Amino acid sequence: MSKIVVALGGNALGQSPKEQLDLLKSTSKSLVSLIDKGYEIVISHGNGPQVGSINLGLNYAAEHKQGPPFPFPECGAMSQAYIGYQMQESLQNELHSMGIDKEVVTLVTQVQVASDDSAFNNPTKPIGLFYTKEQADKFTKEKGYTFVEDSGRGYRRVVPSPQPISIVELDSIETLITHGTLVIAAGGGGIPVIKENEVYTGVDAVIDKDKTSALLAAHLQSDQLIILTAVDHVYINYGKENQRGLDEVSVDEMKKHISDGQFAKGSMLPKVEAALQFLEKNTKGSVLITSLAGLGDALDGKIGTLIKN
């Protein structure tokens, strides 16, 4: 039985709980069709917009004496539960409609990072809402946040994005899979923790979910990693008149595109880097990058970027 890790992008999940649920209902049909065809899948997801909104809302409440401030790791855990719940519901309903008897479980997942990771001094991971330059400057002045322009869509807050070292709950994930459970894990790249003297402590950061997904896929010896985002292909010259979607490309070709500066930091670059990390560990595997809405067409080979060695 072929194994596939499917990583859903947080930006591709819509801008509200209802929009997210509607998108997940559609996506669940494609995911369950994979199960129906005999594939074993594990699902991960991003949380950039969601964790940023949760953090912003709780901070607003705290500033107005309506509750305590919440640390970022706890906000990450809330986003795993919120997104995971909607995924579970959508997948359970679709599995039932297809007559497939399968449990679905969301596992709150911690991922170990290094306390001396250079990312803590160089925040790059966009989270939360898009703002104008004026709004971003105001937040920077008032709260000390760091903002970057995000692919022509506006300005977003950025936080540290350290490299994932190990998945704390990996054994539990493998046990659930062995028992035939459909597992949703490593949401938002996992809750980042550091380990000192055998004690785990959460840190303020967001791990790139694609890199954690690549790590998970490698550990599970998956045949394919599917990265779902907001666009149908990986593009070169993105946003320009001569932009071009890539169809099937080799690892060497993708490395050249990276060296040419084709992919934006905090956007497509980490997805491509994650793809290459997985293919380095699993040389016979493949990575498919496409849109959440277009997964069905991508599985039929009509759209998407397929990367192989």
Swiss-Prot record:
Pathway as given in its UniProt record: Metabolic intermediate metabolism; carbamoyl phosphate degradation; CO(2) and NH(3) from carbamoyl phosphate: step 1/1
Keyword entries, A-Z: Arginine metabolism, ATP-binding, Cytoplasm, Kinase, Nucleotide-binding, Transferase
Single Gene Ontology MF annotation: ATP binding
Pfam families from the UniProt entry: AA_kinase
Catalytic activity: hydrogencarbonate + NH4(+) + ATP = carbamoyl phosphate + ADP + H2O + H(+)
Locations listed in the record: Cytoplasm
SUPFAM superfamilies in the cross-refs: Carbamate kinase-like
GO cellular component assignments: cytosol
Main location: cytoplasm
GO biological process: arginine deiminase pathway
Domain of life of the native organism: Bacteria
EC number assigned by the record: 2.7.2.2
UniProt family annotation: Belongs to the carbamate kinase family.
The protein, known as: Carbamate kinase 2
Source species: Staphylococcus epidermidis (strain ATCC 12228 / FDA PCI 1200)
